[in-house]
């Protein structure tokens, strides 16, 4: 059987959800447990102006566990709670295999109705998360969160009930601050509870995705504001906290599935404009240096494909060209390519081999051009439960 379009796009998340075990189902209440253990052995290297580092590793690659509880009220109304963890700490450098403390990736509650849509509150994915179509298991060359945040502390609304337009999803999200200055010892002892500098202060995004009749089309727009350091947090510019103030971004995708061939071709793209504010550095009471405001523009295009080579075996890949320019003269161009093959050994066991290569050139006024290269190849195994 040819692979369905949903399976081609949703990928591993859909697989983990499909393999979840129902541990309780009674009187309108359903509880599911699921997850996966993921291990990859890899070889990677990076080269920047003839300086090379090579790394071989056997490590965790996104192992996770989730629990979902759904309560049906009748007349199409329902409530849902969802918790998903990762088996990796916030400080992976302390453990080269990337296994660490269990952390919360998503935790949210949902109130909804099949006819009117649903409202989601908590740490969750946003409408921007599922916009692009490119497939990858580990080395994805697209970095969508630089354009629009794909998850966070959010209040979101999703609607799927438009008559005659099955496959159309409309969504909107409002992002709230998630990172705040903690209590106790801190570089900012008098700012406890305030949004941490250069972290998301608030944001809004809207989007739509159509996935039916062999056609895929989606677009999302987001405006995200970041907490500025300013004189309150860094009056003399000593901490180097960054100057990001606001990002406006767009992500889009367009694809078509040739169902008779088991082939999906797609084109992803994005554009973002980042505003950086003016700062004043002072090394002494009598001397100040003003860093003027500037804008950074970023864009990419990425054609890709997903093809069912044979039953339970799929080939996928994509190419990306990305350009970043600053109105002060600095420009960066990146070309990247990814290719992979996956095979199901069992309905709950997936193995794959994936490789990626990226080449980056950076030009700045009065400076020598810098070239960077990254190469990665890995063989992975996922066991779902």
Swiss-Prot record:
Presence of keyword Transmembrane: yes
Main location: membrane
GO molecular function: porin activity
InterPro entries according to UniProt: Gram-neg_bact_OMP (IPR050298), Gram_neg_porin_domain (IPR033900), Porin_dom_sf (IPR023614)
Signal peptide coordinates: 1-20
Disulfide bonds: none
Location relative to the cell: Cell outer membrane
Effect of substituting residue 281 to N: In strain: B2 and B3
GO annotation terms (biological process): monoatomic ion transport
Topological type in the membrane: Multi-pass membrane protein
Reported effect, residue 237 to S: In strain: B4
This protein's UniProt keywords: Cell outer membrane, Ion transport, Membrane, Porin, Signal, Transmembrane, Transmembrane beta strand, Transport
Family designation: Belongs to the Gram-negative porin family.
Function per UniProt: Forms pores that allow passive diffusion of small molecules across the outer membrane.
Quaternary structure annotation from Swiss-Prot or TrEMBL: Homotrimer.
Leftover remarks: The sequence of strain B1 is shown here.
Record protein name field: Outer membrane protein P2
Organism, as annotated: Haemophilus influenzae
Gene: ompP2
């Amino acid at each position: 059987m040819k692979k369905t379009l949903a399976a081609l796009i949703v990928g591993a998340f859909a697989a983990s959800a499909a393999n979840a075990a129902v541990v309780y189902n009674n009187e309108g209440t359903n509880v599911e447990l699921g997850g996966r253990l993921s291990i990859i052995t890899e070889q990677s290297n990076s080269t920047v102006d003839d300086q090379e580092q090579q790394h071989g590793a056997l490590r965790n690659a996104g192992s996770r566990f989730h629990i979902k509880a759904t309560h049906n009220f009748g007349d199409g109304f329902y409530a849902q709670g969802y918790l998903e963890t990762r088996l990796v700490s916030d400080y992976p450098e302390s453990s080269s295999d990337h296994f660490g403390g269990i952390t919360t990736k998503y935790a949210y509650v949902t109130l909804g109705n099949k006819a009117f849509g649903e409202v989601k509150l908590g740490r969750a994915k946003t409408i921007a998360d599922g916009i692009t179509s490119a497939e990858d298991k580990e080395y994805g060359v697209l970095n969508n969160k630089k354009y629009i945040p794909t998850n966070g502390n959010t209040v979101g609304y999703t609607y799927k009930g438009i008559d005659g337009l099955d496959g159309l999803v409309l969504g909107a999200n409002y992002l709230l601050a998630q990172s705040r200055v903690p209590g106790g010892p801190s570089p900012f002892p008098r700012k406890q509870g305030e949004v941490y500098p250069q972290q998301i202060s608030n944001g809004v995004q809207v989007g739509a995705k159509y996935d039916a009749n062999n056609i895929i089309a989606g677009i999302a727009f987001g405006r995200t504001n970041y907490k500025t350091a300013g004189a309150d947090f860094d009056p003399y510019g000593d901490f180097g906290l960054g100057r990001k103030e606001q990002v406006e971004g767009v992500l889009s995708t367009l694809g078509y599935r040739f169902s008779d061939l088991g082939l999906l071709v797609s084109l992803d793209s994005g554009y973002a404009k980042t505003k950086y504010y003016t700062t004043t550095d002072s090394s002494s009471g009598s001397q100040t240096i003003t860093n003027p405001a500037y804008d950074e523009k970023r864009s990419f295009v990425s054609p890709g494909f997903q093809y069912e080579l044979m039953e339970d075996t799929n080939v996928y890949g994509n190419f990306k060209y990305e350009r970043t320019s600053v109105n002060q003269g600095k420009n960066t161009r990146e070309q990247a390519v990814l290719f992979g093959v996956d095979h199901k050994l069992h309905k709950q066991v997936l193995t794959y081999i994936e490789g990626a290569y990226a080449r980056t050139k950076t030009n700045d006024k009065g400076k020598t051009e810098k070239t960077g290269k990254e190469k990665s190849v890995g063989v992975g195994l996922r066991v779902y439960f």
